[in-house]
């Protein structure tokens, strides 16, 4: 009985209370606007903090991209309630050019092959778009285009290396909440892995666009796929048509 009484006391005064204690916002790397929007429970806060701590340990053993202060860069450009388009990526570029925004790279880095194909589709469908000589997509993010990788870090030279450390539950939570709380949004899901996230999105109020990934590997593949090719998918035109119909204002895709 004494042992059971101690167990009950520990459960009430230690373990339960520990779960109720949250984590300071700065330790979650997220801006206050996003912390307010996500309303992470104390348990979820601790879970996210554990993933961040895990990545910090991995950084002592190998080079990890992007730098910690860039991991949540996708959340810095606009109020979450102002997001109009969500473009999902997989994990960051693993060659040192990742800047925290899916598909984007900082000025001074070559335009990656997948982004070149994105530019090609933009030019095909929107003749006023001229492919720039850089890969910085900050201008899109500032207009309400959320460029979110589903995995937020990667080891140098090893794509997919951080797929199982715990980022996916967090980005799934972000996607689900955006679907729940936004009135109308365009979700662009390119490739099979991004397409799997369609189940998190309410397609009755949002426009969900899927196609193959813009990578040259996917575009040059001769294997049959249920998804249409990226080039020719018309997603950027369809997105602006939807936004205009909803009275939200179009995205200026020019860079």
Curated annotation (Swiss-Prot):
Entry annotated with the keyword 4Fe-4S: no
Keywords annotated in UniProt: DNA damage, DNA repair, Host nucleus, Hydrolase
EC number: 3.2.2.27
InterPro entries: UDG_fam1, Ura-DNA_Glyclase_AS, Uracil-DNA_glycosylase-like, Uracil-DNA_glycosylase-like_sf
Compartments it resides in: Host nucleus
Single GO molecular function: uracil DNA N-glycosylase activity
List of catalytic residues: 91 (proton acceptor)
Membrane-crossing segments per the record: none
Gene Ontology cellular component annotations, sorted alphabetically: host cell nucleus
Catalytic activity annotation: Hydrolyzes single-stranded DNA or mismatched double-stranded DNA and polynucleotides, releasing free uracil
Enzyme class: hydrolase
GO biological process annotation, one example: base-excision repair, AP site formation via deaminated base removal
Pfam families on file: UDG (PF03167)
Entry-linked Gene3D superfamilies: Uracil-DNA glycosylase-like domain
Matching SUPFAM superfamilies: Uracil-DNA glycosylase-like
Cited function: Excises uracil residues from the DNA which can arise as a result of misincorporation of dUMP residues by DNA polymerase or deamination of cytosines. Therefore may reduce deleterious uracil incorporation into the viral genome, particularly in terminally differentiated cells which lack DNA repair enzymes.
Family (UniProt): Belongs to the uracil-DNA glycosylase (UDG) superfamily. UNG family.
Protein name per the record: Uracil-DNA glycosylase
Gene label: UNG
